[in-house]
Amino acid sequence: MKKLISLFALLAAGSFSSWAWAEEASVKILSPATGAKLDSMAQNKATYEVVPGPRGDHVHFYIDGQEVAVLRQLKGSYTMETLGPGKHELCIKVVNKGHTPIGVQQCINVIAE
């Protein structure tokens, strides 16, 4: 019985430690801020931090629903081409190795003037 309890405790500890070490996926667009006014004549930069989690591999960057870049760095920046005047939606989505979004993303709205 003691061996059974010891085995159970060892298995439980191993399962817990694996669970504790697995980070949840997350995306943070650090800049620009939501609602920021960007220069429509400039190449603006977006900075980000990503934790891909156990199901993610890298991220894709979208402007107004169109994929514009595949980003392999988990912390970095992306310089956008000039944006036409008006509202724009910027999104970063975590994707798997097959480039399929896993449902973890952040989107912000900006205004180019």
Language model segments and positions:
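Short acidic/polar inter-strand loop motif in beta-rich domains
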Residues: 96-103
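N-terminal signal peptide c-region/cleavage motif recognized by signal peptidases
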Residues: 15-17
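Short beta-strand segments within Ig-like beta-sandwich modules, predominantly Fibronectin type-III
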Residues: 67-74
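Beta-strand signatures of extracellular beta-sandwich domains
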Residues: 58-62
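Short coil/turn motif common to extracellular beta-sandwich-like domains
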Residues: 38-47
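Surface-exposed, short loops/turns at beta-strand junctions within beta-sandwich domains
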Residues: 80-89
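Short, compositionally biased P/S/T/A/G/V-rich stretches that sit at domain boundaries
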Residues: 22-39
